[in-house]
């Protein structure tokens, strides 16, 4: 598919007013030099609300491919249910987003952690409040395929360094807001190309795909980042490229936008398992057959 521009967004689900972990990288269709987009209004950091307003304000005459680093849905295919044995459990991804949003309406800035306080639903999460009795280390089909390169953390886990669940809760609220502005892949058909497309990304996968691993205490070096960018047909970042904090969120955003542009040219990266209509799919994970 052809796009006018690409955004790679390293995500954060934390409760703060501003999210230090949100970084936004951009490439246009003619450029091979990715750049970091600064937050609006001279703020030092983005927050989720300002980012969503920014995405809504983009030129409607252009088509963008936008990648968010969070799981777009929960496992479904293993038990044919997101929340096993829960009455009125949602049965589609869009109903799931609305469900998560509804149980967090009192929270500003798209924070999603209030669901841990809803008695029956909280039992499915490993959260900062408690480990629910129905919590399971479940995996989506796309995560099973990704495991050949590196394994994502379980989406119901919201505790510890591998906790992706908090980001997904906030992210699903965001998808519920943006679903009328953009096609969200792979849940929507992509016939309306004017709307642009939002996909799920996994920055670690894009590094590991080329056997690039961070050092234990220092993270990715500039040389490693540039080696990875070269694999995705992008120019290196300059020696003045800055990364702040141990998570190197800028590096994740930069490699993601390069990978997005690279993968978008190849039809095989738009193919998914049939279960992806319920669970979502990590963009860049190659699907081979339905035998899972």
List each model region and its residues.
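RNase H-like (RuvC/DEDD) metal-dependent nuclease/polynucleotide-processing core
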Residues: 2-7, 11-292
């Amino acid at each position: 598919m052809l796009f006018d521009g690409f955004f790679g967004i390293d995500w954060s689900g934390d409760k703060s007013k501003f999210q230090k972990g949100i970084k936004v990288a951009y490439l246009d269709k003619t450029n091979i030099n990715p750049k970091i987009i600064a937050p609006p209004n001279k703020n030092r950091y983005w927050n989720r609300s300002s980012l969503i307003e920014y995405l809504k304000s983009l030129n409607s005459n252009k088509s963008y491919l936008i990648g968010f680093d969070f799981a777009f849905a929960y496992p479904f295919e293993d038990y044919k249910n997101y929340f096993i044995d829960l009455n009125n459990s949602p049965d589609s991804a869009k109903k799931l987003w609305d469900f998560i949003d509804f149980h967090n309406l009192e929270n500003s800035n798209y924070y999603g952690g209030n669901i841990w306080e809803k008695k029956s639903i909280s039992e499915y999460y490993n959260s900062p409040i408690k480990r629910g009795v129905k919590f399971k280390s479940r995996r989506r089909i796309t995560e099973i395929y990704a495991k050949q390169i590196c394994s994502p953390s379980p989406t119901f886990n919201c505790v510890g360094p591998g906790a992706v669940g908090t980001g997904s809760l906030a992210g699903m609220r965001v998808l519920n807001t943006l679903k009328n502005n953009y096609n969200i892949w792979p849940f929507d058909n992509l016939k309306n190309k004017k709307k642009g497309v939002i996909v799920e990304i996994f920055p670690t996968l894009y590094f590991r795909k080329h056997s690039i691993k961070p050092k234990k205490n220092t993270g990715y070096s500039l040389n490693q980042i540039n080696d990875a960018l070269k694999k995705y047909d992008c120019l290196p970042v300059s020696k003045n490229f800055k990364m702040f904090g141990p998570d190197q969120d800028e590096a994740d955003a930069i490699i993601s936008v390069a990978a997005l542009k690279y993968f978008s040219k190849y039809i095989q990266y738009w193919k998914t398992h049939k279960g992806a209509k319920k669970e979502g799919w990590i963009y860049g994970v190659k699907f081979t057959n339905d035998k899972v």
